[in-house]
């Protein structure tokens, strides 16, 4: 009697050997629920929707046996690592601009996509993401006695600069609360140099005028939040 691996069809004499056996096909099946793998799977589906017009018949089994599996999983894990603020939009941008799959994990591509996305994204999305980021930061830093309300006032300036330059904190928030404005005024020249390209004051001040209702809505929420 032999025992057969249902993933690679290899046969074993002992059931215990089959149990500890880990072929590539089995490994891919076992990691199917990992966040990075799922993001890679979604990107794979979107790739086929964009290039072939439909991916209705594409299953995880199709993905796991695809020659593109490793490339898309690498990309999915990259999205997790960089904390991509909108994985679907970024994937669509890569496809629309015909970026080679082998290059999808390059930081330069994300940096190229991000500024335009921050200008186009829904105001509510920017606000919700920022408030969550502030709350997460406050949860990890109990020394902030007033929680996320102290984010701009007493948070680590370099960390906040990083949050702004990676899109975690949008100009919608920085420019529309007292804490954000005070934070910008207190930056040193090096920090200002990093932040400035991401907050583009001329552009955003005009946008706030063009979308006055959204601006007043954001200001009201941030004021009530104590920021």
Predicted regions and their residues:
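Charged, amphipathic alpha-helical linkers/stalks
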Residues: 29-74
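Long, mid-chain structured domain cores
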Residues: 108-176, 181
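Charged/polar, solvent-exposed surface patches and flexible loops
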Residues: 20, 24, 39, 46, ...
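Surface-exposed polar/charged interaction patches
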Residues: 47-54, 78, 82-85, 96, ...
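C-terminal recognition-helix end and immediately following basic linker
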Residues: 1-41
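Extended alpha-helical scaffolding regions
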Residues: 60-137
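Charge-dense, extended regions
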Residues: 148-227
């Amino acid at each position: 009697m032999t025992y057969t691996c249902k993933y690679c069809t290899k046969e074993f004499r002992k059931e215990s050997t089959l149990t500890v056996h880990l072929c590539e096909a089995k490994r891919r099946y076992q990691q199917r629920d990992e966040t990075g793998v799922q993001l890679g799977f979604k990107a794979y589906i979107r790739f086929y929707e964009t290039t072939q017009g439909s991916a209705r018949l594409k299953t995880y089994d199709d993905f796991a046996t695809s020659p593109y599996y490793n490339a898309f999983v690498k990309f999915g894990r990259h999205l997790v690592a960089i904390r991509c603020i909108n994985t679907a939009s970024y994937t669509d941008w890569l496809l629309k601009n015909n970026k080679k799959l082998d290059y999808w994990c390059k930081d330069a591509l994300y940096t190229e996509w991000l500024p335009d996305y921050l200008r186009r994204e829904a105001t509510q999305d920017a606000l919700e993401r920022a408030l969550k980021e502030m709350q997460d930061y406050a949860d990890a830093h109990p020394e902030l006695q007033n929680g996320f309300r102290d984010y701009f006032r007493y948070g680590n300036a370099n960390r906040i600069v990083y949050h702004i330059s990676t899109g975690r904190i949008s100009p919608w928030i920085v420019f529309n609360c007292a804490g954000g404005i005070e934070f910008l005024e207190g930056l040193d020249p090096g920090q200002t140099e990093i932040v400035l390209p991401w907050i583009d004051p001329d552009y955003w001040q005009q946008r706030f005028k063009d979308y006055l209702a959204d601006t007043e809505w954001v200001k009201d929420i941030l004021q009530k939040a104590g920021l």
